Design a protein with these regions (language model features):
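Long, non-catalytic architectural segments outside compact domain cores
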Residues: 1-55
Length: 55
């Protein structure tokens, strides 16, 4: 099973690629926003996991 951090990281990459391929500006903006949101979630999951291990 894929971890949350890995899933969010993968989705961030997918959305960045979609943003680069988008034809319209609204689509590019939307995919870039999703990429940013998924990247933040991946970072949060990683930080939470590190905190749990060191506690």
């Amino acid at each position: 099973m894929e971890s949350n951090a890995r899933y969010y990281s993968r989705r961030a990459v997918e959305e960045r690629m979609k943003a680069q391929r988008a034809i319209t500006e609204p689509a590019r903006t939307w995919h870039a926003k999703l990429a940013h949101d998924f990247a933040e979630r991946a970072t949060a999951c990683t930080e939470t996991a590190k905190a749990a291990v060191s506690a």
